[in-house]
Amino acid sequence: MTETSFPGWHGTTIIGVKKNGKVVVAGDGQVSLGQTVIKGTARKVRRLTPGGHDVVAGFAGSTADAFTLLERLEAKLEATPGQLQRAAVELAKDWRTDKYLQKLEAMLIVTDGSLLLVITGAGDVLEPEHDIAAIGSGGNFALAAARGLMEADFDAETIARKAMQIAADICVYTNGNLTVEAIDA
């Protein structure tokens, strides 16, 4: 997702990498309006602890919309403790069918350490191939870089950081100011 319906607002880059029993979610800190960087230190990766179960979530798209979705996800996780996939599917169903939520423009990458999922407003809950998920304006660059690095002797955090740096070097809507959260399987 590279833009919202608000003219000129551009997204971010978020990547999730799962390797050797660890999942890392990393996101850049840039918020842009047209050709102007509004903020370079936004935090778009969060750790949630509903019911004492750790979940890491990263978002791309409208910040207000993403926070609304994160609150809903947290409520779903509290209702179904330790069941990330079920909570994600319930959120996606609500997002797809609720008239208010349908207007929200964001995407999420979420993990509990065992599952790595992408949740979209189209009602998709996707577990990515190759244990890598990437969203946002630089998502394809980060995904390609991470796939190339997976066979090397790097851990999940190193792969995520290197992939994000490559995306930041290519995508003008992505910077190198990263927020990184790791979670064990």
UniProtKB/Swiss-Prot annotation:
It catalyses: ATP-dependent cleavage of peptide bonds with broad specificity. The active site is at T12. Allosterically activated by HslU binding. InterPro entries: ATP-dep_Prtase_HsIV_su (IPR022281), Ntn_hydrolases_N (IPR029055), Proteasome_sua/b (IPR001353), Proteasome_suB-type (IPR023333). Na(+) binds at A168, C171, T174. Its EC number is 3.4.25.2. GO terms for cellular component: HslUV protease complex; proteasome core complex. One of its GO terms (biological process) is proteolysis involved in protein catabolic process. It is found in: Cytoplasm. Pfam families: Proteasome (PF00227). One of its GO terms (molecular function) is metal ion binding. Keywords: Allosteric enzyme, Cytoplasm, Hydrolase, Metal-binding, Protease, Sodium, Threonine protease. The keyword Cytoplasm applies. Belongs to the peptidase T1B family. HslV subfamily. HAMAP family: HslV. Protease subunit of a proteasome-like degradation complex believed to be a general protein degrading machinery. PANTHER family: ATP-DEPENDENT PROTEASE SUBUNIT HSLV, METALLOPROTEASE TLDD. A double ring-shaped homohexamer of HslV is capped on each side by a ring-shaped HslU homohexamer. The assembly of the HslU/HslV complex is dependent on binding of ATP. This is ATP-dependent protease subunit HslV. It comes from Dinoroseobacter shibae (strain DSM 16493 / NCIMB 14021 / DFL 12). The lineage of its organism: Bacteria, Pseudomonadati, Pseudomonadota, Alphaproteobacteria, Rhodobacterales. The gene is hslV.
